Design a protein with these regions (language model features):
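Polytopic transmembrane helical bundles with strong interfacial aromatic enrichment
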Residues: 1-191
């Protein structure tokens, strides 16, 4: 068991980020409620770009680097990164998926027949899998890591075990993000 002893770091969870979560959810609700196609599309594209870009960066750039980094460097990166992703990633995934559904309804994609509806079904399947993976695994791991890093003697072996699975899950998420880009470009060019 590897432990690092230092001063008690205090709370690393940045609770004030909940204001940003509330603001993002409010913008989403407004975009859906006023049924403005441009605003709904903007919120969907913006949140989807954030979700996709961060997933791809984390899964294919940062993950491999951290797996090879010194344990103290990994700890510091996790202490800085985890609190930021704790609220950001669930929020962008919820906003992207929800606005995507309402956008599909507003554009008539949900009324398509087969085989065209297969593209809609593929998008729904991918978003559902990514959201379940994100909210059901990645977010809890983020919470566990945050709580462990707040301890004076954080168990880095335990954290490394969680983070190993975390980065594999993020790489899986990134692969699904690439698949959904294929589906979205099909929507954009016409089904």
């Amino acid at each position: 068991m590897v432990s690092v002893s230092n001063e008690r770091p205090g709370s690393i969870i940045r609770w004030h980020y909940l204001w940003y979560v509330a603001a993002a959810l409010a913008v989403m609700v407004v975009a859906i409620a006023i049924q403005n196609l441009w605003l709904l599309n903007y919120v969907h594209v913006f949140s989807s770009l954030l979700w996709t870009g961060i997933d791809l960066f984390m899964g294919f750039v940062l993950g491999p680097i951290l797996r090879r980094a010194d344990i103290s460097a990994r700890r510091e990166v996790m202490r800085q990164l985890t609190p930021r992703t704790l609220f950001l990633m669930p929020t962008v995934s919820i906003v992207a998926g929800t606005t995507g559904w309402f956008l599909a309804v507003q554009l008539g994609y949900t009324a398509l027949g087969w085989p065209e509806y297969g593209w809609v079904a593929a998008a729904l399947l991918l978003v559902t899998l990514m959201t379940v993976l994100g909210l059901g695994f990645l977010t809890p791991v983020n919470v566990f890591v945050c709580l462990e890093l707040q301890k004076a003697n954080a168990d880095l072996t335990k954290i490394n075990g969680w983070m190993r699975w975390y980065f594999y899950a993020v790489a899986t998420q990134g692969t699904m993000q690439i698949a959904i880009i294929v589906v979205m470009t099909r929507f954009r060019t016409g089904i």
